[in-house]
Amino acid sequence: SWNPPFCGDLDIRIARNGTWFYLGTPIGRFELVKLFSSILKVEDGKYFLVTPVEKVGIQVDDAPFIAVDFNEMEINGEKALKFETHVGDQVIANVENPIRVERDAVSDEPAPYIHIRNGLDALIDRKTFYRLVEIGQHKKHENENWFGIESASSFFPIIKSEDLDNSI
């Protein structure tokens, strides 16, 4: 694991929609964004691009990645959901890569995420979240009824069943 010296902040920002900006201008080259995403690290809630010789800070508005799709598959006879990010990372939702849903404090809108690697998350885009909800199910979780998603022998609660029933 590289531990190069911190060399200051770069004017690079990852917007909530996954767009990377340099000096306020979108980075249009996918290959460059993919390269940068491969050296992205998070430490104590701060984001860095890390190479063997330097470490620079960048700004991330929400999550650094966007989960743009998932596929249902079987692993050892069990259903699993394989997610893909906008930069091509693929992960299976499981104990190591859990799905979680946070609620916006003002609007109460759900903000769904999946862990990608080393503390880095992807915001699950709206169309993908709607597809997830279509395959969701009600299940007992920590002694309460929840609506959630099952993948790789793990259950990921989205909303309490009673809250879902009250919101319809």
Residue ranges of each PLM-predicted region?
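Long, non-globular segments of proteins
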Residues: 1-168
